[in-house]
Amino acid sequence: MKIFVLLLSLLSLQAFPQVFRYDIDKIPANLKKNANAVIRESVLKVDIRSENEMVYFIKTAITLLNRTAISEYPFIVYYDKSSIVKNIMIHLYDKNGKQVGKVPASEIHDQSAVDGFSLFTDNRYKWYTPSYNDLPYTMEYDYEIRCKNTLLIPSFIPVEEPGLSVEQSRYELTAVKEFPIRYRAYNSTGKRSDSADAKRNYVTWSISNIPSFSISNYELPEEYIQPKVRIAPVSFVYEGYKGNFTTWQEYGVWTYKNLLEGRDKLPEETATLMQKLTAQVNSKEEKVKIIYNYVQKKTRYVSIQKGIGGLRPMTATEVDQLGYGDCKALSNYTMALLKSVNIPSFYTEIYGDRSGRDFAEDFPSLQGNHIILAVPLEKDTMWLECTNDKSPAGYLGTFTDNRKALLCYANGAKIVRTKVYHKEANIKNTLVNCSLDTFGNLTGLVNRTFEGIFFNEQLGMESLSEQKKKENILGDFTCNQPLIVYYSINVSKEKIPRVEEKINFKSTSFAGLKKDLMIVPLSLIGPTMEAPDNVVKETDPFYIRHGFTKKISYEILVPKNYTLENIPTPVSTILKTGMIQQNYKFADGKLMVDFTLMLNEGVFPAAEYKDLILLYKSLEQFKRIKLIFQKVVKSGN
């Protein structure tokens, strides 16, 4: 009998007892609100058995409330040659919590993370998307991963995506005493319990009832609002290489020695070619541009899906021969080419996304998902995005600009901030010269320039077909059915990168006619601004990631014998969040309008959100303005 009881106890440690019936009526109403799916139960057990053995046990039950959830939250797990996925079990439950299916192994797909490139065939993922259509329903899955590497310990992130709420989530960490761990909690991570026995330390975090969040304009980045526990080792093993990770300095030394050292060797003929290409140039910056341009023309970027690809780049020789690589490989290759002409550069780990996520400087741990290159100049640092074959040297787009990243070198590493584009650099200028005929038809020329973050937004236009270019341009016009007669684009990749556009257009019946009146709308082409929620915030601060300056000038020649009846009053609204200015002038049959919208970057207190709303409303009011011109009838006619 004692043996039987002991056996049951041991089994209970490995099994996940079903403590929930997945009846959707049991989901609290606040968790269904604005949610596509609800995590009913999530358990992640991480068992670190030695410095080179770690096992995860994962169980998740997720109720899919609508069709969006089916595509957004499939079962997916990544693995590589250093990890093994085992014991996958997937069950489906109907809206009442009754089991309606067990997914056979044959329906769980297994494929390469990057198809068509044999170099990456060890990087794979397993996935399954339910074909059950009777929404809502619940998918429950269990699996385990056995891993030889202990550098990256999973973080506890109860809810990672917008539209997802959490009923209950738990993280159980077990580590042998010989493997001490570090952790740092952010943004209210629920309850924590600690315990230990003679051989192991145990930490458990649990949290419940987390409503879904949405990403709206001007919200703080997710890292400032999401519950999260970062977990990192004191010492670790990665692909057989031991290292310490209590400081950034230690990690930098390990990275250089084990991931980079010796992988920058080039074929002799390639090194000689670099020296020839740069022989007539004295400026270090110009030499960097020449080599960066060479990389852009010679190589192409191969994307490896997140979580896959390892940390070590391909060798520079492999990239030179094959002509492709991921961010690690292309950055390492560019670094090797620069080294061949005696220009030092530094491999830089960064988290690439549109929100500008910083490295947490106070908690050394593996935090990046992308690699770029830093080239120190005499007065500045030149940043190279080696995966982009169109951007000029030194330009970073919104995916990597203005955030803390980790610059690695032979003797260590340090946290640095990447290039910042302030409102004075983010400029979009629009100049419209046009004329109206007596039938209200408008013919004109638009000249637009884009700098700073706007440069990257418009750069892709250059490679589009003529038809696609016109379609995109039409989307910028707000007037009635414009006809694009001619379009040209010029991309300048000099010190201040700039896109210049010229657009010849016609708009039939642009102005309204009523007896002797001509009614002219000012809504023609921009400017725009992301809309804030039309609700004044009470407590939460808000965030403007990129400030900018947008200017638009209209010069409209009206038919002879028309005079302006209702010239608007000039406007100058200056607030902490930004500024709007409007000026109007009518002389010699020509209407001149100047409009400037400036938005300031930064984090602002909730009390100033009403000012942001005011700026937006002022912009919308400007675009609704209609000017009335009166035809002057000469006496005696």
Predicted regions located by residue number:
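A sensor for short, sequence-defined functional sites
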Residues: Q18-N637
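Bacterial Sec-dependent N-terminal signal peptides
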Residues: M1-R21
